[in-house]
Amino acid sequence: MSEMIVKVKEPIKQEYDLVQKGQVIFTYFHFASSERLTQAMVDSKAVCIAYETVEDPDGSLPLLTPMSEVAGRMAIQQGAKYLEMAQGGHGVLLGGVPGVDPGTVVVIGGGVVGVNAAKMACGVGAKVYMMDMNLD
């Protein structure tokens, strides 16, 4: 038995029964999104350390920030893909072309994910609006 398991992604269903009492597992668990995963880890009696909850003394989340940056940037790429007619979209090109206005992107939330989504959308030439409750 391994005493410690270090992963990037959360354990998949096929791995649940392999987790044993007392093992320490470091990974991005995202427990809020999977009741089944949460219950499996509770039942295993393993020590689960979720990267996304590790805090610096100032309260920042140093292990969540890089993944959030990637998520924000990927959101624009995925959204752009689904604007293509081949994907059932309306054939909108986010950056536009000469004579055609660029697409409009509304980003809800100005946290790490939202800011990176806005940067990516601006980078491809979209018209970008950001909405957030915090004016800072």
Tell me the role of every PLM-derived stretch:
Residues S2:
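An anion/phosphate-binding loop that grips the pyrophosphate of nucleotide cofactors and donors
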Residues K7-V8, Y28:
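Short, well-ordered coil/turn residues at beta-beta hairpins
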Residues K9-P11, N134-L135:
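Short, polar loop motifs at secondary-structure junctions
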Residues K13-T104:
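Glycine/serine-rich phosphate-binding loop and adjoining beta1-alpha1 elements at the start
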Residues G88-D136:
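Glycine-rich phosphate/diphosphate-binding loop of Rossmann-like nucleotide-binding domains
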